[in-house]
Every structure is written in structure tokens, then in C-alpha cells.
Amino acid sequence: AFVKGSAQRVAHGY
């Protein structure tokens, strides 16, 4: 998922 969001980045580990 290419979405700019810290929450999603943390969930994916980026």
C-alpha cells in the first residue's frame, strides 16, 4: 500500500 502515513509505515516496517 503506497500511502503516506506514519501509522501504515510502522505497520509495514518502513
From Swiss-Prot:
Signal peptide from the UniProt entry: none
S-S pairs: none
Name assigned to this protein: Conomap-Vt
Sequence positions bearing Tyrosine amide: 14
D-phenylalanine carried by residues: 2
Cell location: Secreted
Transmembrane segments: none
Metal-binding recorded as keyword: no
One GO location term (cellular component): extracellular region
Protein's job: Is a potent and mollusk specific excitatory peptide. Most potent excitatory effect are observed on the buccal mass. It interacts with non-cholinergic receptors. As this peptide is a major component of the venom, it may play an important role in prey capture.
Molecular-function GO terms, alphabetical: toxin activity
Additional facts recorded: The mature peptide does not contain cysteine residue.
Keywords annotated in UniProt: Amidation, D-amino acid, Neurotoxin, Secreted, Toxin
Source organism superkingdom: Eukaryota
Tissue localization of expression: Expressed by the venom duct.
Primary localization: secreted
Keyword match Transmembrane: no
Organism: Conus planorbis
